[in-house]
Amino acid sequence: MRALVLALVLAAPLAAAEESVRLDAAPIDPRDVASLQAGARTFVNYCLNCHAAGMMRYHKLLEIGLNEQQIKDNLLFTADKVGELMNVAMTRREAKEWLGTVPPDLSVIARARGADWLYTYLRSFYRDSESATGWNNMVYERVAMPHVLWTLSGQQVQVDRKFKNMEQAEGIARQQKSAWKIDVLTPEQAGKDAERFILKTIRTETPGSLSQLEYDLLVRDLVNFMTWMSEPNQLERKQAGYVVLLVLLVLLVLAYLLYKEFWKDVH
């Protein structure tokens, strides 16, 4: 709970800045075991080097169809036993010294941010020579995190296009397959330039080892796993909710019949 509250607090100041970014719907399915297993592999290989998942133990991965030997052979790199937490070897002090900040714990990041935000964010990095890491992000401007998946996705650059009205900008924006946002300049900012609506998109400049479709699928699996990790019992919770609603419906019918029986002789 403390990790969730902290994640929500850290996310709050960025809400206003991210409202203009169009988020893609994350095509995740927590029942897709193959997707969850692939996402777990990507998470351990690329995310767990810097980010911990301090509320998740390795043995929970048994619930997505993996056995202990598979976990030990393929996923257990930062611990000795399957029952241990998914922590990183790097201390907070080392992280601050090497990275300039402490990477957030990702245990409940999906509950704090949402699957759509994560799915769009991980597909929205672009090269920025003015950034300390050489990277920026369409969803989270001036993000401190570098693009750790760039060898897979390739290198993208930001493209700005100006339009005279919002309708033109939105018409072109809806044709984009990547994240986009529209900045609106005030008349004072625009000056004599009548094109006040700036559509910001990204395009691939240098291809990676994966095609765009393959990279989108990899990110989908990763977000699917992170969403499951934030609440491993979500399917059971939803099933229990349906049962509770069914019981309440039956009780409502019984209560109505009882009411009719009590008042049938009252005129």
Go through the PLM ranges and name each one.
Residues A12, A16-R41, A52-E63, Q70-I71, ...:
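Electrostatic cytochrome c docking/interface patches
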Residues R237-H267:
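Juxtamembrane interface at the cytosolic side of transmembrane helices
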Residues R2-P13:
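Bacterial N-terminal signal peptides
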